[in-house]
Amino acid sequence: MQSTGVIDRFLDIFARYIDSGFGLISGDVGFLASSLIVIDVTLAFLFWTWGEGEDVLARLVKKTLHVGFFAFLLTNWNALAKIIYLSFSGLGLKATGAGGAEDLLHPGRIAQVGLDAGRPLLDQASALAGPVGLFTNFAEIAVLLLAWAIVLLAFFIIAIQIFVTLIEFKLVTLAGFILVPFGLFGRTAFLAERVLGNVMATGVKVLVLAIIIGIGSTIFDEFVQ
């Protein structure tokens, strides 16, 4: 696991730097949210004052719920993003009967599964090889080595894809943390809607990868045994 653990270490370094960004920009995001709330509420108050025959109380309740919803999102954004990730990955792995969602946070384990799955092929090729066997069983050895390389390459590609997807998800959530406050003001709400859609789209990508990993891990676990 030492050789494949470097992937997890790189992921941990990237994740720590990205997660620290939430704390570094939280003050600026709070100021932006407060400014947009003041602008939105001020404009709404002016329209209510000039309007005739409008239900001010109903509009006030609606505006309060709207602001409260986005305040909840901003306060718990990082935790909610992790819940979304674990939910999508958990559903994908549960659909295939594989491990827990936390396993998907360690792409090095996926690479290790590939090494374990390919070891019987390598052992069989070694058993066929010898002073004379290398020439008499050349075709069988070549096929086994090719199969071992394909299995190894497939799992390493999936591990790298998981690494990239995790980094992408964290970067999207960090960008979302900056853009979500724009949902507090009607004229800029489209920015928040777009980033929320991107978070969900990245979550679906995690779900698909989890299903692929779950199926592959199950098949090759049986193969190794």
Label every model-predicted segment.
Residues 1-36, 46, 55, 89:
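Binding/recognition "hotspot" determinant
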Residues 31-43, 143-151:
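Hydrophobic alpha-helical transmembrane segments
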Residues 73-171, 211-225:
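Non-cytosolic segments of integral membrane proteins
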Residues 54-73, 77, 193-205:
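Alpha-helical transmembrane segments and their helix-start/interface "positive-inside/aromatic belt" motifs
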Residues 144, 170-225:
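Hydrophobic alpha-helical transmembrane segments and adjacent short intramembrane/lumenal linkers
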Residues 41-64, 150-153, 157-190:
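Hydrophobic transmembrane alpha-helix segments characteristic of membrane transport
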Residues 16, 20-27, 51-59, 132-137, ...:
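Membrane-helix interfacial "entry" motifs
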Residues 12, 16, 59, 63, ...:
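Short amphipathic alpha-helical coupling elements at transmembrane boundaries
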